[in-house]
Regions:
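C-terminal-most transmembrane helix of multi-pass membrane proteins
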Residues: 8, 39-42, 208, 244-312
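Specific transmembrane alpha-helical segments of multi-pass solute transporters/efflux pumps
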Residues: 20-21, 52-97, 130-133, 216-234
Length: 312
């Protein structure tokens, strides 16, 4: 897989996760986060097991235990995300979730891995764009939902870094399948403690079942498997840079499907400017022109040539 192909795959994941806020909003507010995780991850595992049945015999040993580690991190991420999204607007949730672009470089610095010059240039543009697209205002009260989303964001940053190490040495497909299995098992055990009747305690509606299936297929089965493959050919910061375009995708979806997002979601000039800044930042951080000595030399020589022509 080339770098361009990897970026396309990662952007498709961003599209899935951005649209997932729409379907999470359609779930009952009182639906337990553990029930949500059990059903979406369990259904995702069933889908993957059917499609890749022949590969299941290789799901053992180190791959199985590494997928369990990933599952534990994902469980924390999904629980906090579910608690956060149910309490704050979709645009705010998308903004806070995109702050992974800040936490990943910080954690990498702790691991003595420095971001590139392009990363340093692009991240401020992305952060400025995130503030404008989210509509977050200075002095606004800090809601509990925001704190939940920050916690989810931190665990997502840890997940991206850990996946980067695991996928370089193990089969991404098996890691993804094992992760879905472990998440479903862990979530079900926690749900069993919270509500012994589990599935029998729920009130099922067509809207809820449709949302669960779409979340399981796109935001779980597809997104996590493709994330595994994408990270095999990309570094953690590149992954989070592409993921930071999520608010732009969410904003576009809000324009296309306004009734689903509600009347509070509106398009403004500030959001347009914010979206442009995010795209500029993503392009800067996702390329390497500042570290490309040949390109910089050509630009310098080109500039000197133009000055020489003007002087003559």
């Amino acid at each position: 897989m080339t770098r361009a192909e990897s970026n396309i795959v990662l952007f498709s994941i961003t599209l899935c996760w951005a649209s997932s806020y729409l379907f999470v909003k359609n779930l009952p507010p009182d639906l337990s986060p553990f029930a949500y995780m059990t059903m979406t991850s369990g259904l995702a595992f069933i889908i993957l097991a059917i499609v890749f049945f022949a590969r299941l015999r290789d799901l053992k040993g180190r791959v199985l235990w590494r997928s369990a580690i990933l599952a534990a991190i994902v469980c924390f991420n999904l629980v906090f995300e579910r608690l956060g999204v149910s309490r704050i607007p979709a645009s705010t949730a998308s903004f806070v979730a995109s702050l992974t672009i800040v936490f990943v470089p910080l954690f990498l610095l702790l691991l003595k891995q420095r971001p590139t010059k392009n990363n340093v240039l692009g991240i401020p543009f992305i952060l400025a764009g995130l503030v404008l697209t989210s509509g977050v205002q200075r002095g606004a009260p800090l809601e509990l939902g925001v704190l939940y989303m920050v916690a989810a964001c931190i665990f997502m940053a840890i997940y991206v870094i850990v996946v980067d190490g695991f996928t370089k040495n193990d089969d991404p497909l098996l890691l993804g399948i094992g992760q879905m299995l472990w998440v479903a098992v862990i979530a079900y055990l926690l749900w069993l403690v919270e509500e012994p009747r589990t599935f029998f305690a729920l009130t099922y509606t067509n809207e809820m079942l449709a949302s669960i299936f779409l979340l399981a297929f796109f935001a779980r089965a597809y997104a996590y498997i493709m994330l595994m493959y994408g990270q095999r050919y990309a570094n953690p910061i590149s992954v989070t840079v592409i993921a930071s375009t999520e608010p732009v995708v969410t904003m576009v979806l809000a324009l296309l499907i306004p009734d689903t997002f509600g009347q509070t979601e509106s398009f403004t000039f500030a959001k347009l400017v914010g979206g442009v800044l995010i795209v500029i930042g993503a392009i800067c951080a996702g390329t390497d022109f500042l570290d490309n000595a040949d390109l910089l030399n050509r630009l310098r020589l080109g500039g000197k040539g133009e000055k020489g022509v003007a002087a003559s």
